[in-house]
C-alpha cells in the first residue's frame, strides 16, 4: 500500500543458522527500502543470510513472474582459496536439512504482509535441492 516515494522501510526478519541447531532462534531484523523491487528485496535477504549463516558463500537470485525465486548456491572461485564450500560444509548429510530450512524460511518470509514470493527453488550444480 506504500505508494509515497518517501524513504519508508520495511522490516524483514532473518533467522540465524547457528541458533537453528540449538533450537534457539536468534532473529535479526533487516531494514529495506519499501519502494525497492521484489528482486532487490530478495537479494538483500539472500546477501544477509549468506554473510550471517553461510560464510559469505555466493548465491544467485532470479525471480520468475512475481512469485517464484530460483536461488543458485554457488561455490567460491577456486582461485580465491577459500576453505569453505556449500558441498562440504552446508550440504553434507548432517546439516543439509538445517541449511535448506534456514534458506527456505528466510527467503519465503511467510509472516511478511507485503508482496513477496510464494515459492523458492534452490539449486546446487544444476540440481534442484529438496528436504528428503
Language-model-detected regions and their locations in the chain:
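Bimodal "functional hotspot" detector
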Residues: 1-132
Amino acid at each position: 500500500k506504500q505508494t509515497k516515494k518517501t524513504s519508508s522501510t520495511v522490516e524483514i526478519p532473518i533467522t540465524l543458522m547457528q541458533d537453528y541447531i540449538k533450537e534457539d532462534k536468534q532473529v535479526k531484523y533487516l531494514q529495506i527500502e519499501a519502494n525497492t523491487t521484489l528482486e532487490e528485496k530478495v537479494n538483500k535477504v539472500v546477501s544477509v543470510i549468506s554473510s550471517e549463516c553461510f560464510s559469505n558463500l555466493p548465491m544467485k537470485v532470479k525471480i520468475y513472474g512475481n512469485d517464484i525465486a530460483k536461488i543458485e548456491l554457488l561455490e567460491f572461485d577456486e582461485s580465491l582459496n577459500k576453505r569453505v564450500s556449500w558441498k562440504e560444509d552446508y550440504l553434507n548429510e548432517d546439516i543439509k536439512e538445517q541449511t535448506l530450512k534456514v534458506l527456505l524460511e528466510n527467503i519465503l518470509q511467510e509472516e511478511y504482509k507485503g508482496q513477496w514470493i510464494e515459492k523458492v527453488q534452490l539449486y546446487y550444480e544444476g540440481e534442484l535441492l529438496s528436504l528428503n
